[in-house]
């Protein structure tokens, strides 16, 4: 008799965005003429940059000729892309990385979910609350989180770090020792950021406690303000304790193309039961070479084109487009009387629901009355209740239309 990994039974009934899709589809069946505007899941709407498309075309043509055909590529990524990543994303900020410290992958979602495999199941993990669900769910699957408390909306062995309105949506250090710390800045879902000084507090904590920070930096390209670090490695000592995840998905429109990278400095040590230290970099390389065959050559060629002079201009134009959407959403919600966070250094706007209205209740009201779909804060954790996320990744026309509807129908 085949038996399941019973940790899967501890997961919520459906993934957050699957539940949203179910409710939207049900509403559309009942209201086929409704013009639904989706500002929920963080998928992009702008096409790939022309320079990226051209690079991918050329790469595909190479794959069609025997003399330039490429089979299995290096699991860690092609050197031509890794060199550009280091030279453009890190060196200008004074961060020195080795070629073997960057791992190209098919997405930050899969990397943030898979990285926990290296850690023992007895490690204590900490997450901000609200939080991107993948961090929690992947650890539930591994058996690291304990059982789910339906009353609290939390797992028994996770240390939750509340991000509250009173605390400006920024987490405080854990009061109990932890081994794994998930941080995402600019933050999904709140859109908030940390200063270099605030981030240093976390790095210092990790160094003192031999903890490891799993730092999701997927939205760094959207940072607008001075003084906000683009990489955790801008903080002294971070190379000893932090893994950084980045993605081309939102930056360059690769949500359907799939390319990202993870930085694992060779300075980071992880310990066995005897206290002996082992290289986290080597363990991740071992994991990747066993379970991953690398990102396709045409996709990596497209990603490398992002770093050309023309590529940088085209990508920046797309980022500017989305951040103008963010401004429209943020200012429109404020005009309508809503309390909002984010939308300045990130493409997410985190709004407080009216009065004591629950976030799923607000979801249904917004969909039925304004025909606008967002993401209920409760889907990101217990401390997300009473809040709601809108994204700036829609088209300009739909973004403006959605805000006008909210201002007219949701006061």
UniProtKB/Swiss-Prot annotation:
GO biological process, one term: lysine biosynthetic process via diaminopimelate, diaminopimelate-aminotransferase pathway
Top EC class, one word: transferase
Binding-site residues, pyridoxal 5'-phosphate: 72, 108-109, 132, 188, 219, 247-249, 258, 293
Residues that bear N6-(pyridoxal phosphate)lysine: 250
Record field: transmembrane: none
Annotated substrate binding sites: 15, 42, 109, 132, 188, 293, 389
Quaternary structure (record): Homodimer.
UniProt family annotation: Belongs to the class-I pyridoxal-phosphate-dependent aminotransferase family. LL-diaminopimelate aminotransferase subfamily.
Protein name: LL-diaminopimelate aminotransferase
Annotated organism of origin: Desulfitobacterium hafniense (strain DSM 10664 / DCB-2)
């Amino acid at each position: 008799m085949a038996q399941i990994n019973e940790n899967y039974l501890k997961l919520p009934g459906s993934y957050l965005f699957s539940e949203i899709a179910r409710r939207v589809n049900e509403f559309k069946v009942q209201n086929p003429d409704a013009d639904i505007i989706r500002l929920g899941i963080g998928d992009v709407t702008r096409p790939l940059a022309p320079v990226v498309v051209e690079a991918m075309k050329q790469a595909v043509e190479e794959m069609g000729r025997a003399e330039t055909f490429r089979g299995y590529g290096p699991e860690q990524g092609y050197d031509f892309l890794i060199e550009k990543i280091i030279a453009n994303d890190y060196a200008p900020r004074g961060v020195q990385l080795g070629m073997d410290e960057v791992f190209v992958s098919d997405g930050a979602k899969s990397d943030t979910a898979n990285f926990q495999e290296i850690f023992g199941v007895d490690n204590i993990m900490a997450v901000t609350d609200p939080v991107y669900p993948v961090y929690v769910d992947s650890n539930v699957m591994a058996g690291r989180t304990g059982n789910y408390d339906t009353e609290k909306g939390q797992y028994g062995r996770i240390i939750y770090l509340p991000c509250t309105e009173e605390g400006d949506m920024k987490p405080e250090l854990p009061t109990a020792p932890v081994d794994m710390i998930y941080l995402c800045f600019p933050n999904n879902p709140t859109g908030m950021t940390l200063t270099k000084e605030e981030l240093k507090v976390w790095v210092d904590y990790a160094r003192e406690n031999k903890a490891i920070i799993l730092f999701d930096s997927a939205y760094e390209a959207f940072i607008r303000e001075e003084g906000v670090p683009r990489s955790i490695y801008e903080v002294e000592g971070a190379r000893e304790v932090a893994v950084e995840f980045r993605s081309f998905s939102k930056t360059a429109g690769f949500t359907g193309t799939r390319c990202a990278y993870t930085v694992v400095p060779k300075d980071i040590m992880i310990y066995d039961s005897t206290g002996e230290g082992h290289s986290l970099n080597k363990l991740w390389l071992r994991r990747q070479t066993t379970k991953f065959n690398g990102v396709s050559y045409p996709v990596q060629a497209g990603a490398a084109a992002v770093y050309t002079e023309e590529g940088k201009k085209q990508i920046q134009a797309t980022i500017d487009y989305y951040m103008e959407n963010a401004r429209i959403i943020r200012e429109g919600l404020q005009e309508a009387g809503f309390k909002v966070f984010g939308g300045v250094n990130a493409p997410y706007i985190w709004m407080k629901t009216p009065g004591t209205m629950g976030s799923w209740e607000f979801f249904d009201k917004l969909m039925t009355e304004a025909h606008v779909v967002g993401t209920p804060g409760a889907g990101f954790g217990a401390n997300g209740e009473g809040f709601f996320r809108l994204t700036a990744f829609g088209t300009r026309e739909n973004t403006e239309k959605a805000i006008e509807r909210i201002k007219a129908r949701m006061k």
